[in-house]
Curated annotation (Swiss-Prot):
Gene Ontology biological-process annotations: embryo development ending in birth or egg hatching; protein ubiquitination; ubiquitin-dependent protein catabolic process
Function: Probable substrate recognition component of a CBC (Cul2-ElonginB-ElonginC) E3 ubiquitin-protein ligase complex which mediates the ubiquitination and subsequent proteasomal degradation of target proteins. Ensures germline precursor cell asymmetry by targeting germline proteins for destruction if expressed in non-germline cells. This process also requires elc-1, cul-2, rbx-1 and ubc-2.
Keywords: Developmental protein, Ubl conjugation pathway
UniProt organism field: Caenorhabditis elegans
Outcome, altering C447F: Prevents interaction with elc-1
Top-level taxon of origin: Eukaryota
Pathway assigned in UniProt: Protein modification; protein ubiquitination
Annotated protein name in UniProt: Zinc finger-interacting factor 1
Subunit structure: Probable component of the CBC(zif-1) E3 ubiquitin-protein ligase complex formed of cul-2, elc-1, rbx-1 and zif-1. Interacts with pie-1, pos-1, mex-1, mex-5, mex-6 and elc-1.
Length: 489
């Protein structure tokens, strides 16, 4: 097990206003019938805008229109598909198996032309504090780009003995591309969490030898307490409900520890910050990466079960000794949100302040909206912490980026190694740019975009560049005048 910190990470700085933004035309019709979750259950998250799940070839992105909190009745049988070659997104129609409200699922590409979905099967409408049994339905759809349809191909169900609290069950479907976990038998699995103490493994594609769900238990409070040397009581919601981020045989968690994490839940007052100046807990507050080799854990659990008198009583579990990496990747997030996206070995941990999203206006405009004051403050606020960081799960290298981003911006890694920043406006209007300091898109793809006449640069980019140029020339002229005055004196 290695224990290190992110203090040696690279810090790159740029302003997104200085990058050419590509406009993305909206090709679908206008829809107006929406149903909103009650304010008290509302969770602000980056799925209120599109978080594209890229196909293995990298050309297509797919997501559900509407997100978790904004439900469009007329879009229950459709999915949004973004074509990088034409820089357009449209709605593909599903021929059957339409989702019911709340229309939430986990999306992943099983193949270049097959989409898989995982939904939670609820037998009854539970109260916010009820425990829901974790029963899943897995469905597959063939993607026809010629007819812009998703053809239903089959489904199956999985039952477990685990439960999840009803008020946040949908957080098990966080925005991951669906990286498959590879076990000791070379079977592929999708990994989810019940948000408290268990991982649930579902077959990536069910076969005759891989068709049942598996469970792995853990006690995150105990594990983290052993690393910090101080007893902690983690808030699962703040730590993204222990969502597992998979890469090959490993599972990564990104754990947030704040000043409230050292107080038992029943004694917390979230209106106060009791230990902000406590020097004893300060080194242990922040965002930490924890990595466990799940392949070895499962293999050991299965071997123990084989030699047990009652195999069904043996519980596969990981603990402190199974952790291969524990490190701090950023300081404590204060009054900030955190969202995570992944593709392959690249994970983007994004942070943004509460004030940059206008919740009332967001409801009215059907997607997250930042008002002008928030944009102005965000672009002039100094000093700033890094807006996001990219973590290479293979080399463990961290690249921190201060990019002046807002809560309405979504940072997404692409299969090519590029990183995109999508900016959303009302009615899913959007533009995007390729971020510097990362691998650029291939020349072949850029040529395809030019030949298809799909590259349209946002005209506001040129206005901004002109303003910046004028400001630069004015500052230069002022400096020269001051220099001349000093010489004359």
């Amino acid at each position: 097990m290695s224990e290190c910190s992110a203090s040696t990470s690279q810090l790159s700085t740029f302003c997104v206003n200085e990058i050419p933004w590509k406009l993305v035309p909206q090709t679908c019709d206008e829809f107006s019938e929406y149903e909103f979750i009650d304010e008290k259950y509302r969770r602000l998250s980056d799925v209120e805008s599109f978080v594209w799940k890229w196909s293995p070839c990298g050309r297509y992105g797919i997501d559900l229109p509407g997100g978790r909190d904004v439900i469009n009745q007329q879009l229950r049988d459709r999915m949004a598909v973004f074509d990088l070659h034409t820089n357009k997104w449209t709605l593909y129609t599903m021929d059957r198996g339409a989702f019911e409200i709340p229309r939430v699922c986990f999306l992943y590409w099983a193949r270049n032309d097959i989409i898989g979905t995982i939904t939670l099967v609820k037998d009854y409408e539970a109260g916010p504090d009820d425990e829901i049994p974790l029963k899943f339905k897995q469905s597959f759809f063939y993607v026809s780009h010629e007819t812009q349809t998703l053809v239903y191909s089959g489904s199956c169900k999985y039952r477990t003995n685990k439960t999840i609290v009803a008020s946040y069950w949908y957080h098990i479907f966080e925005n991951r591309r669906g990286e498959p976990f590879i076990d000791h038998n070379n079977y592929l699995w999708l990994v989810f969490s019940n948000g408290v103490d268990s991982l649930i493994l579902l077959p990536f594609i069910p076969t005759s030898t891989c068709f049942k769900a598996k469970c792995v238990s853990f006690d995150m409070n105990d594990i983290v307490s052993q690393f910090t040397g101080i007893r902690v009581f983690l808030d699962p919601f703040v730590s993204s409900h222990y969502v597992p981020w998979v890469y090959r045989n490993d599972v990564n968690f990104f754990i947030r520890i704040d000043s409230h994490s050292f107080i038992e839940e029943q004694n917390r007052d979230y209106g106060l910050d009791p230990q902000i100046d406590n020097p004893e807990t300060k080194p242990h507050r922040g965002v930490f990466q924890l990595r466990v080799n799940l392949k070895d854990v499962i293999e050991k659990g299965e071997k123990d079960a084989i030699h047990a008198v009652n195999p069904e009583t043996i519980e596969t579990r990981f603990n402190r000794g199974d952790i291969e990496l524990w490190r701090k990747i950023s300081d404590e997030l204060r009054q900030e949100h955190q969202s995570i996206a992944q593709h392959g070995k690249m994970v983007v941990v994004q942070r943004w302040s509460h004030f940059t999203v206008d919740m009332g206006l967001s409801k009215k405009m059907r997607t997250r909206v930042a008002d002008l004051d928030a944009r102005d403050y965000c672009c002039s606020h100094k000093p700033r912490n890094s807006s996001f960081c990219c973590i290479d799960l293979d080399s463990e290298r961290i690249k921190a980026v201060d990019a002046l981003i807002l809560g309405t911006d979504v940072v997404l890694p692409h299969p090519s190694g590029s990183v995109f920043l999508f900016r959303y406006k009302e009615n899913y209007g959007m533009s995007y740019c390729e971020l510097p300091f990362f691998q650029p898109l291939s020349l072949k793809l850029k040529c395809i975009q030019v030949l298809k006449e799909s590259v349209e640069i946002d005209p506001s980019y040129y206005r901004i560049k002109c303003c910046l140029k004028m400001q630069e020339e004015l500052e230069k002229e002022t400096a020269e005048n001051l220099c001349t005055i000093n010489i004359q004196q």
